[in-house]
Amino acid sequence: MLQLCDSECDGLSSLMECGGAVNSPGDTLGQSPAHLAACGGQAFFLLWQLQTGVDVNQQDCFGEAPIHKAARSGSMECLSLLIASDARIDMCNKDGHTAEDVALSCGFLDCARYLATIKLTQDTFSRAQSSLHNLKETAAGVKRGQCCQSISHGKRRRSDGFV
């Protein structure tokens, strides 16, 4: 697989020399320049791609997004850039593996731990947002109930006590 990444990096420069579009599947495997940069651990080139509007979740013919390629190469820098650009860490390739699974199978334990921590943080944040939304709905219902109790038969009380 490393030979594949090396040949992809060689193809990266020729792809860009030809003026390939940022999201175009530039090679026969359907890999964009971002896939190639992530696979080669080329964080600066990947950053440039991200700034030009690359689709960080575009999948190649293997179902792999750039985050899978970065995990396969063990590039913490590329993983960080992709996550900061809202790459989906729960996306599976055609074999059903997430980027965390790929990093683990390639022996990049730090990358796998990093991805697991990000996933846990995102899950916790999502649950907290959901709980906050439910709490706001409950509070709004209580306010509506209190408002209705202060009105007697659809009329407001006068300050002198008469209805």
From Swiss-Prot:
InterPro entries: Ank_Repeat/CDKN_Inhibitor, Ankyrin_rpt, Ankyrin_rpt-contain_sf. Keywords: ANK repeat, Cytoplasm, Nucleus, Repeat. Gene3D superfamilies: Ankyrin repeat-containing domain. GO terms for cellular component: cytoplasm; nucleus. A motif (Nuclear localization signal) lies at residues 129-149. This is Ankyrin repeat domain-containing protein 37. Pfam families: Ank_2. It is found in: Nucleus; Cytoplasm. It comes from the Eukaryota. It comes from Xenopus tropicalis (Western clawed frog). PROSITE patterns: ANK_REP_REGION, ANK_REPEAT. ANK repeats lie at residues 29-58, 62-91, 95-124.
